[in-house]
Amino acid sequence: MPRYRLTVEYDGSDYVGWQRQENGPSVQGAIEKAVLSLTGETVSIRGAGRTDSGVHAMGQVAHLDLTREWKTHTLRNALNAHLALAAERVSILDAAEVPPEFDARFSAIRRHYLYRIISRRSPLALEARRAWWVPKTLDHEAMHEAAQHLVGHHDFTTFRSAHCQANSPLRTIDRLDVTRSGELIEIRATAQSFLHNQIRSFAGSLKLVGEGKWTPDDLKTALEARDRKACGPVAPPEGLFFMQVDY
């Protein structure tokens, strides 16, 4: 039974998240329905990351097993045709046959995320579902300085959801950079894995630094508190993009 790796792009605005759920449409469910329409097979696909409602992806990775072999470009194009027919905001960017031991989630060695903030007085029209609108000037250099306190191996209890199901709050952040281009501020994060709501918690707290409400050292103090109450407000989902997975 051949195994295929799919690289997936999606607009998460109208989905309950990546994972199949009973309370609304999911990205996983949309792809599984497309596979069923194409092949007649009921499959369960596994993604590299379980993005929340409203979170987007430009490089989510998933795998699935099919009973017959497919030319990979045919599989990609056929799935995209079925997704388009169902008016899904999901696109298969690439399909590749992989060894049976490949696992989209557990074989990953690094995940890359981007959080976008647009800092300007005027509300967003075109970018309203793809960035966090902050109607004031932010000091991105102070935000970047603060972010470096979060790089490395730490207990991130402060920056994970109270509903996080991970066994341990310990994670290693390889990269957390804040840059600015005009009115766009980008927060780029890299790690092998992240905790639930971790990046959005980072972004919300870094915004406080950018506003001057916190100093960079205040972020370090929040980290060391190991207390969810020490976290700033969680940033909204629309600014978060799952960019890439390394294997």
UniProtKB/Swiss-Prot annotation:
Belongs to the tRNA pseudouridine synthase TruA family. It catalyses: uridine(38/39/40) in tRNA = pseudouridine(38/39/40) in tRNA. One of its GO terms (molecular function) is tRNA pseudouridine(38-40) synthase activity. Formation of pseudouridine at positions 38, 39 and 40 in the anticodon stem and loop of transfer RNAs. It comes from Sinorhizobium fredii (strain NBRC 101917 / NGR234). CDD domains: PseudoU_synth_EcTruA. The keyword Kinase does not apply. Its EC number is 5.4.99.12. It comes from the Bacteria. This is tRNA pseudouridine synthase A. Keywords: Isomerase, tRNA processing. Pfam families: PseudoU_synth_1. GO terms for biological process: tRNA pseudouridine synthesis. SUPFAM superfamilies: Pseudouridine synthase (SSF55120). The active site is at D52 (nucleophile). Substrate binds at Y113.
